[in-house]
Amino acid sequence: MIKKRNTTKISVIGAGSVGATTAYALMLSGVATEIVLVDVNKAKTEGEAMDLSHGADFVQPVNILSGDYKDTESSDIVVITAGAAQKVGETRLQLINKNINIFKSIIPEVVKYNKDAILLVVSNPVDVLSYVTYKLSGFPKERVIGSGTVLDTSRLKHEIGKRYKIDPRNVNTYIMGEHGDSEIATWSVTNIQNIKIDEYANKENLEYNDNFRKEVYENVKNAAYEVINRKGATFYAIALAVTRIVKAILGDEKTILPVSTLVENYYGIKDVYLGMPCIVGGSGVEKALSIDLNKTEASKLVKSAETLKNTLNNASGL
């Protein structure tokens, strides 16, 4: 549990596009009194911290520093965005061997100075690297969280909201499983303000059929690739997703977010990190919710878990 104190310290490991934008989003949100940036590129990290600090007059009081692992000591949350960037045409799972080696150098240093912190993994492939972090850190599963499918779920809500011309915040649904190509959309539990999506579409004379579901799902699944093809990287939306998770932890909100957590017995899935609806609060993941899926969704989720397990088993350096 995050202890009540007058200051809140968040460290961000990795000051690339995702890390720096996450620090910016955290700064705007006002959730932290201190933000520490750490990266192998010292000059860039110093520049990012300076640039952010120059906006201090426009936000709630916050001290932004660049430093090394020692400077992260006693963080409430350590956000890990470091790793090789996903290239055009490269899947998240193809990044694994590069980033496992990076994490083997990062995690021991983070743990050395942050015995009580919650670790929030953002680097891709996030589910695999969350599991790697869990194993390397020795922390309880509740305190090792992946950003999971929080962003994918937002993308799904956006797609449905855009097509139905409604506020995406009124769409209740989840993307589950891998944050990547084997993720699943939980159409069977999707609703618009507690009205099942098929009933809502029928009542409002809107499209809802196999073609609709396929198009929406493909747009969500391929969203990152489309952004990367156009601008080289994704970082704004994931920074907002990370900030949402951080706020849930620091505020002990006990809100439900589809973060990546260790699954221990769900449709026979065990010992793998997956994006799952979880109650997120001051202790991190306080409970993973076992929502009822239909047979097709459950089968796809099992396959998603198998994909991640096979990737872990075939990865070098573990």
Curated annotation (Swiss-Prot):
Keywords: Cytoplasm, NAD, Oxidoreductase, Phosphoprotein. Its EC number is 1.1.1.27. GO terms for cellular component: cytoplasm. GO terms for molecular function: L-lactate dehydrogenase activity. It is found in: Cytoplasm. NAD(+) binds at V18, D39, K44, Y69, G83, A84, S105, V122, S123, N124, S147. One of its GO terms (biological process) is glycolytic process. NCBIfam families: L-LDH-NAD, PRK00066.1, PRK06223.1. This is L-lactate dehydrogenase. It comes from Clostridium botulinum (strain 657 / Type Ba4). The gene is ldh.
